[in-house]
Amino acid sequence: MNETHRIPSCFAPAVLLAALYVAPLGAQDTHFAPKNQQIPPPPCMTIRGAWEGGYVACTPLSHQQWLADITHWRNERRIRTGFDSSRYELPALQWAQSAFMQPQMMVHDRYFYDPVAGKYTVDKYVDDLEKRYGGIDAVLIWATYPNMGVDDRNQHDMVRSMPGGIEGLKQMVADFHRRGVRVLFPMMMWDQGTRDPGAGWPDAIAAFMKQINADGINGDTQDGVPLAFSLAAEKVGHPLAFEPEGGPSDEALSWDVLTWGQYQFEFVPTVDKYRWLEPRHQVNIQGRWVRDKTDDLQFAFFNGEGWESWENVWGIWNGVTPRDGEATRRVATLERSAAPFLISQDWEPLYPMHMYGVFASRWPLKDQTLWTIVNRNEYNSDGRQMSTPFKEGTRYFDLYHGVELTAAREGDQSVLSFPIEAHGYGAILATSSEPTAEVRQLMGKMATMTKTPLSAYSHEWKAIPQQLVPIEPSPLVASTPVGMVRIDGGDFLFKVDGIEIEGTDDIGVDVQYPWEDSARRFHEQRMQVKAFYMDKYPATNADFKKFLDATHYHPQDDLNFLKDWQNGTYPDGWANKPVTWVSLDDARAYAKWAGKRLPHEWEWQYAAQGTDGRIYPWGNCDWLPVGLTAVPTTVPTKGCSVFGDIKDALAPIPDKGRVMLPASDVDAHPNGASPFGVIDMVGNVWQWTDEYVDEHTRASILRGGSHYQPQGSIWYFPQAYRNNQHGKLLLMAPSYDRSGGVGFRCVVDAK
């Protein structure tokens, strides 16, 4: 039987008034309807100025009035939406109800995959998170954006490009399962411009996830995953937990059993609408860019829900501070142990507390009750915290500190006193029975943790440094090698911007050049460039075939290697097209064989731009005939030629179909030469240059853009045709990094 939450006798006359207040609610709108995805607190929790009567604490009566109002809203809303709870009762999906900690993990994270050893390192990844913040319950494995669109691979092609292909994916998922971690993948319904999957996305996703035994799907940018996806998964006998990024409709809670919560937080915690409608619905609070996680964690703990512990944000490291990591460990430990309480249909949020700025939720379960508590104040709170109706034989345990409390009886109330530190947490258990062995174990664990206050842990956020991967000089040459162009040295203003879609100019966006103290989006540096020789054209298929014939080179990770070749050679008519589907390591191997090296990015830009700051290698004019446009189109037109025919274009015509067409021959656009006479630098295929690395991510700078422009979404890998722009491609493994839109050219150092 649930513990009775009785009103003290002194409030008995007012109870009738409260009943009269709420009685008409069955026939009228509620007073506290949700705003966006959050239910507002009662008015008594609003701080008023002295001229408005000052602050008056909420009473049990005002709390009951508010609770009755939002309960009425919930009951009515369930009826109006035809709420169906059957999916929350499916054994295959019940894991989601206790999946409190879920990072979005970029597949490029160096803790997840070791490209040198050529193997997934799931244990290393999970061990690191256990050490830093107490581990995870689920993981969202992200292999698509921001790289998708660099060629015509669709979202599933990108995942299948991961090392080992399907068998590698199945083993990797099994490794997470072995560690007790459920696995989700994203789906991008905005991906309508790359290769057609050949089947409807609901069926394609259901079949693929069953094949690799994944547990769920995150709906990227979606405000609800449509019912068709759940039905498709159930049809193949593999139910999936669907988790939209945005706020779904209330109706969608019948099939979307997970949700991200991307909210703005006030001092007084609001009630999560989705959690209130169905306490078994798991919400993962997500604030990818915030550096102080206190609001996220406190809101999650108050609402009994989870947190998206996302640190590697598109290759930009926004790491959890030691203080937030320790807070996460404590919140996760308590929530995992209390999971059965946190799905209680009798949840009472904003339970009346004595101390200002301390807020609690009450979670009854059979003959026990749990309170999850947060202190929103910047100062410690100690003393009389809460009252609960007196009941003979009830014992109270401070689970957070791992100690039993002695309640003070005041009339018909038991008053509990305990400390809760600034921006801290509390958890109280009321029980009439002897604590179980599990509760005793939890208390021992929490007592050990909380010997050190959260305030003892650093809350300073720090960026992690990046390093440029060195490029060994080539053998020096005194005269221009065949097929190369001399680039005389000179004074150069190297000015370039990263074109990442997200991240504004936060520290960590883009790259950190050797002369900079942090990664950032906008770069400018005056330098002296030494003379060198550059390939007049990108390396062609014929060039690469000579390399293979001479060396019998074959990479250990050969998935997608020369994907468009057959029987060891390129298609007819492709000899003079740029070689693609080669990784950075493949390109380096070719360069070493040829006595060359890959260029530093500033060398590439210097060869393309010269010293006059031109927009494109050939000047400041767009390169397309009348009636066609390139991106970007905001270029000067005064003094530019008007092309009358496609053959007159200075670079390839953009390819906007779902299937990427072959690249142009490297010598097809001689009029697009740079000031030094280097050809085919822009708009045919991207070209590998420098690699950057930090503790968690590797990336390569791509230059020149490509002919491929998938349509229908702003989220595809953006083009960088201008001389002062570059692309940043996140690296994982050769199989994944190889692309039909990326080639390379080489340089040689001059004596």
Predicted region positions:
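Catalytic domains of carbohydrate-active enzymes, especially glycoside hydrolases
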Residues: 124-144, 211-214
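C-terminal beta-strand-rich structural cap/linker in extracellular carbohydrate-active enzymes
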Residues: 412-447
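Solvent-exposed beta-hairpin/edge-strand motifs
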Residues: 388-402
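An acidic-aromatic substrate-binding cleft motif
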Residues: 61-117, 143-146, 478, 483-488
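Functional-site microenvironments in short loops/helix caps that host divalent-cation chemistry
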Residues: 487, 554, 559-726, 735-740
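Aromatic- and carboxylate-enriched substrate-binding clefts and catalytic-loop regions
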Residues: 149-295, 301, 314-323
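Active-site-proximal substrate-binding groove within the catalytic cores of carbohydrate-active enzymes
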Residues: 59, 67, 238-246, 250-385, ...
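Extended beta-strand/loop cores of jelly-roll/beta-sandwich
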Residues: 28, 435-602, 609-614, 640-641, ...
